[in-house]
Structure formats: C-alpha cells, structure tokens
Curated annotation (Swiss-Prot):
Keywords: Cell junction, Cell projection, Cytoplasm, Differentiation, Disease variant, Phosphoprotein, Repeat, SH3 domain. GO terms for cellular component: anchoring junction; cell projection; cytoplasm; podosome. It is linked to Frank-Ter Haar syndrome: A syndrome characterized by brachycephaly, wide fontanels, prominent forehead, hypertelorism, prominent eyes, macrocornea with or without glaucoma, full cheeks, small chin, bowing of the long bones and flexion deformity of the fingers. This is SH3 and PX domain-containing protein 2B. The lineage of its organism: Eukaryota, Metazoa, Chordata, Craniata, Vertebrata. The gene is SH3PXD2B. Adapter protein involved in invadopodia and podosome formation and extracellular matrix degradation. Binds matrix metalloproteinases (ADAMs), NADPH oxidases (NOXs) and phosphoinositides. Acts as an organizer protein that allows NOX1- or NOX3-dependent reactive oxygen species (ROS) generation and ROS localization. Plays a role in mitotic clonal expansion during the immediate early stage of adipocyte differentiation. The modification Phosphoserine is found at residues 279, 291, 499, 528, 843. Residues 275-366, 458-834 are annotated as: Disordered. Residues 152-211, 221-280, 368-427, 850-911 form the SH3 domain. Residues 822-831 have a biased composition (Gly residues). CDD domains: PX_FISH, SH3_Tks4_1, SH3_Tks4_2, SH3_Tks4_3, SH3_Tks4_4. It comes from Homo sapiens.
Amino acid sequence: MPPRRSIVEVKVLDVQKRRVPNKHYVYIIRVTWSSGSTEAIYRRYSKFFDLQMQMLDKFPMEGGQKDPKQRIIPFLPGKILFRRSHIRDVAVKRLIPIDEYCKALIQLPPYISQCDEVLQFFETRPEDLNPPKEEHIGKKKSGGDQTSVDPMVLEQYVVVANYQKQESSEISLSVGQVVDIIEKNESGWWFVSTAEEQGWVPATCLEGQDGVQDEFSLQPEEEEKYTVIYPYTARDQDEMNLERGAVVEVIQKNLEGWWKIRYQGKEGWAPASYLKKNSGEPLPPKPGPGSPSHPGALDLDGVSRQQNAVGREKELLSSQRDGRFEGRPVPDGDAKQRSPKMRQRPPPRRDMTIPRGLNLPKPPIPPQVEEEYYTIAEFQTTIPDGISFQAGLKVEVIEKNLSGWWYIQIEDKEGWAPATFIDKYKKTSNASRPNFLAPLPHEVTQLRLGEAAALENNTGSEATGPSRPLPDAPHGVMDSGLPWSKDWKGSKDVLRKASSDMSASAGYEEISDPDMEEKPSLPPRKESIIKSEGELLERERERQRTEQLRGPTPKPPGVILPMMPAKHIPPARDSRRPEPKPDKSRLFQLKNDMGLECGHKVLAKEVKKPNLRPISKSKTDLPEEKPDATPQNPFLKSRPQVRPKPAPSPKTEPPQGEDQVDICNLRSKLRPAKSQDKSLLDGEGPQAVGGQDVAFSRSFLPGEGPGRAQDRTGKQDGLSPKEISCRAPPRPAKTTDPVSKSVPVPLQEAPQQRPVVPPRRPPPPKKTSSSSRPLPEVRGPQCEGHESRAAPTPGRALLVPPKAKPFLSNSLGGQDDTRGKGSLGPWGTGKIGENREKAAAASVPNADGLKDSLYVAVADFEGDKDTSSFQEGTVFEVREKNSSGWWFCQVLSGAPSWEGWIPSNYLRKKP
C-alpha cells in the first residue's frame, strides 16, 4: 500500500460567492500534495472553525489548554463580524489571516499537520470538483428569500427556546437573545455569532425577525428519493419510524434539520441527517472540518467534530422542544470516514406550541450588570499574532476561544492574549448607569483638564505598583460599600472641593499603606465612572447648592472638623483620587455593592475606582474619612479599626470625614484616654474616673458638668481642650492606645457621664494624627508639641461642651479654644453651629446606599437639646454618614421612632 500523501503547501487565493442553499462565501484554497498534484478546494469559515475545534480537542497540550505558553496550534482568525457588516467584507478581511493560519497549520510537527483531521479537511471532495449549480430548491413558504438581495448582510434571528450547549463547538442560547446567522445548514445546525462567541446551534431554537421560515415545499414532480442511512424510532405522533436502507420521498425540506417525508403511504417528519440522496452521501448534522465547503443538502460527507458521541448519545430533552428527541445510537455506517465520536445527531424538534412569527420574545433585559474587561497584569506576548499590554487597561473582547486565549482589542491594537490575564467587572446598572460609562477618547482628554492629577495617579499607580501577575492572588479592594453611582460621578469634584474646602473633612482618607501601593490599579475604573467634564461641573454646582442648603437640615451635633491634620494632606491626593490602597492584609472580593464584581480577587488599586476616595490612612489608622457620604464599604473594615464600638461602623463606613476624628477610634481612644488622660491631665482624678470618654469629655469632675470638666482639664494643663486632645492623643491615638482600640466597653461608662459625645470631643485622635500629619487646613494652629494649643479647629472634637450640652460644648469648646480655652460661652455655641454646617456641607449626602445599613447601639447615650438619647441595643438605619463623626439615623427598634444625629462611635454594624 503506497504511503499516504502529505500536504506540501497551502495557499488561500480568494473568496467566492455561492448561492445554494443560501447566499454565502467560500475560500478558494490551492493545495499542493507530496505526490506533486495541485488541487483547488472550497471551504467556508465554519469548516475552519470545526477543524480548529477538533484540533484543540485532540491536542489539548499543543492547544495551550493546560499551559498557554506551550501552545503551538495557530489561532484561527476570530469572528470579525463588525456588527452588521456585509458578508463579503467580513470574508475578505479574513482572507490573509486564514491564509496564514493554513500555512502555520501545515508547518506543525507531522503528528499534527499530517493527522487525519487535517488531511481530510484539505482533501478534494466532489463538491470541490463540481460546485453546486445556481438553482432554487423550491420556494420559501413565506417572505421570499430575503438573503438574495445584495448587499449580503448577516441575518439576525431571535432565540425562541433556551438551549444548553453539549459540545465545545456549540454555544448556549437564551430566550430573547439575538444572534447573527453566519451559515444555515440543512442538517438543522446553524453557525451563528453572538456578541462574544460563535458556534453551532439548533435552528429549531431560532426564528427570523422578519417571520421568514426557511421552509421549502416541493412540488410533486420535484419530490426526491432519499435512502435512510440510520434507523430512527419516532418519538412523537407526527414523526416516522425509519429502517436502515428504506427509500423515502422527501416532500418538504427546510434548514431546521427535520423534513417531511412520505413512506409506505404515510407522511411524517424525519431527521434530515438520517437521510441521504440516492445518488449522494449522508447529510452531516453540522458541517465539519472534513466536510465539503458547500453547506446544505449537498454538504454531504463532512465529519463534524460536533457529532461527538459521548454525551451526545443522549439528546437533551428540552421542554421547549417537547422533548421529542433523545440520544440516537451511534450509526454504524460511514464508520471508516468518521471517528467513533463523530456521529450525526438531529437538532431538537421545534416547539410547535410556540406560534411562528408572532410575538417574538424580546431580547432579555440587559442583565443588571454590564460587563467590562480589564487586564489584571502585565503580559509580553511571544507569538506573532499576540498582543502585549500593561495591567489596568480596558479591553474589548472580540472572541473568547476555548483554548484559553482570547482575541482582544486595546485601543487600536488587537491580538491574542491569555484569558487568565483578563478579568471581568460587572457594573451594577441603575438609574445612574451613565456614571459607569467609559468616556470616549476625546472625553478622556477633557476629563484630564480637571483631574490630571487623578488620571496621573491612576496610571501612575498602574505603572508604579508592581502589577500582580495572575489573578490568583486575591487583592483587597477598598471601596465604598454603597453604590458609587451617586458619588462616583461627582467624586472628583468632591475631592477637589474637599481639599480646597475643608481639606480634611470632605476629603477621603487615602489609604496609604505602602503595601497597597504595590497592587496594580485599574485606571479605567475611574474613567468608566466619570462620564464627562460637564457632568463633573454639574456635580460641583450641585454640591455647592447642597452645601448652601444643607444648613437647614439637621446638622451633626458637634461637627468635628477635620481634626486630623495629617489627614489633610491626603486631600490633595484626594483631589487626584489616589487609588485607595487597602492594606495588603485586607483581601476581599469585590462586591456588587461596589458596582464591581469579579471572579478573582482584585486589589483596590487594581480596581482604582474613583469611588474609593482615597482615604489616606493616618498613621494611627484613623477612621476612614467619610467621603461625601460615600457609601461605606461593607467589606472594608473601616480602618477606623478597632475603635471600641465604633470599629464596627468603620467597617461599613467608607472613609469617614476627617472631621470624624476617628469617632470610632474616639470611643476607644476616649477610654484609653482615660488612663492616659490622667497622666496627661496632670492626674485629674475625676477625669481619670471619667475614664472612657475622658479623652473627649475628660471625665467631668464631680461637681462640674461635662463641659466644665473639659474646661478645667484644659485649663489645668494650660491647654485648650484641643490641645488636650492633642496630648491625649496617646490615649486616643490608635497606635498610642491600643487598649482603647481593644476596649469597646468605654461606651457603657461613658453613657453614665454622657459619653461625651465623642464625635465632638474626639479631637484626640486627630491630635495623634496631627503629629503625624499636618492638620488639614485646620482653622486653628495645630497643637504643637502637644503643648502648644491646638488652634481650635472648628471640628475638633475637643470642645468642652457647655456643661449641659456636651455636643454643643464640644464644638464650642473647639472654637472657644481658639479664643481661649475657657470660653464656652454661647458664642461657642454659635460657632458650633458653623462647624456643623461646614461639616455637614463637607459631608456628601449619601442617602442612596445607606438605606440598607443597619447599626446597633453599643452603649447607652444621653442626649441633649440637639440630640436624642438611646439605649444600648437600639437598632438604627443610617441615612447619612457625616465626616464629622455624627451620623443621621432613624430608630428602627428599641425606642419610639425618631430621626436625628447620633455619634457614630456608639454604633456598630448590625450582624
């Protein structure tokens, strides 16, 4: 037996138009064999697709399924459908890539290039020698042949029944989905393309948008004789039992795989793939790589890899398809040409209960999420048609190949890239969806005008931070837990304003963990959130209006202006929106709340959302400053860290306003402050007793009101309350006072003394931070050396409340300090109001995301004229989180229903 000939050369010459059974294009290929002969063959793109699928199934290692770097099988040019492009344009654009594919294929090692599948694909078939004649098989039942009109544009069909793919070359369908038809085959299997993939699907699950049914009724004289090649047992009353070898008359054909036949005087339906024309070959269920280029009834002997027997033996009984078909036994005929798994299988029957052409299902409502793809690590390609990229770039996925490689486009470049370097973010869609739309290139340049810093920061982080190689390692993502839709858009303005206004109060603390910086950030996230500069300006104006109008709304009792000096520095960064850097130790998956959702864990930096208002992390881990009420991140444990009780809130709260002064921490600080206070306060006994809240309230001396205690303390030390807090820092300072962090109890004692409205008095934390960072544009001088008086920053929590009203006194105290430690006069009160207003203005109303935030009181709180009292265990719904440390809440249980401002350090996230 002479040795089998091998392929020497393959050249794709051109494309040719065919009209039978419907309009399509085939590639003209010249094949030179080792025997010296040169032959011309014609193949459709779908045949190449089938060959590729067969190759990848047969040679998984060489196809890069296990290790993309070991792939040697060339990539089949992706689906270049260009939406509704003319078919010829698509075919021509694929011409050179298909030629390169063929050349690369035959240059592979012999065990691949000379394997049966490849040789069969390039062998000449009867249809190559005698191309189909231009004749109509019959006339369509309705609508006429819409595809006969030039220019040829891909037809679109609507999915009327769900279908779950059963082979790698197939794709799954969902009712209402719209697909582009690339090839209609009489086997009943059509080659289609969706937004992201292409493959074979049963035609019975589709219906033309124009009502055309692709059915041909044959006139009596046109009826053709066919021979049954596989036995078939009817599964429905209108089907026919077939015996191998029987000759039947086909009276009605269609492209859905089921033909009406007449046998022994009876009429019924039979699978077209079980029949063969008396003079022809069996019709394959789906054109395969080895099948002839001509699709349709003449597409007779291709072996489609789609016909894998395993798992195909059983046909999925689809309710929509009436479950009329089941697995057929593997045909024993045609065995020599087909591998055991390559067998024919009819598509499911069409569900006749669904009226044809009427009320086609509407496309599914776009999922609640829109998908965007980004590169998660740097990649340098080693293949000619690959693409190299950096981490954090937005990607347009043109084709998802089962091999693990995706054909992508980044800006104006495209090529193959390993799917493991690309991840998907799902953007929660809502009324503000536009906020998530990525700006167009020209919009990006505009955006840069107002946020050059932000962009710089984003890209910088991407370049600077060592990008994480693969998505394996989860990265913590810092985000505001609430939907960013509202603030994101304006986050830039907010940040800008924040830095300019109260640098610290509105600013977001930027997490500046060096560790976090290492994580790659995804700049695109920011762009995708901010739609346009105009929008930003509009936001800015809106915010300004809000600030002005905000006065009337209940103000946080004693807004603590950004006491933390250092925090303020971040504001500048805030304006750039430095990417929030989560602690390395914090790894968690993005959540939908954030508007993101990804399969692998990503670093906050990677996500780089504008949302994350950079929260600069104070050395002491001050509570995150709350961005304009940016939704807190539920996942993000507020860095406020372990404040006694506040800690929980930090968890959800997004960065708290610097004003907040770590209210959460406050609590802890207060407590610790107690002990430290003693030392700091020169041993004021009562204050020591005051304990927990001492830091802020400096426990009141026995005979004094809370306000007084502070005054006295301040006076004794010769420091203004603020200064005291500065000194107190040790206690409040998270770092200084670990104990405070750990001790959540303070609140309980505090309640007795009136926890000193921590938010106002909490300056201490700031103090601590102040030492580490410059006070954010603090109105008053920072405490210098702890001894210098801290200029009363309006928001500093240290104000000594007028004896009776701790909150007011606090704020007053802070301001009084400015004037003089002891001035707690009514004047202070007025100032407090100002502070509140400022803080309120600084805080961004964040009602949207807070509605579902439930918090529980961790201690009893005694209110004053501006605030209400509540008991430990009371459940609140947080409506707004103010950077001052005061949150506007509504009581849900444990007390009569009321709304008002309460200190956040008395709350913790409800489990």
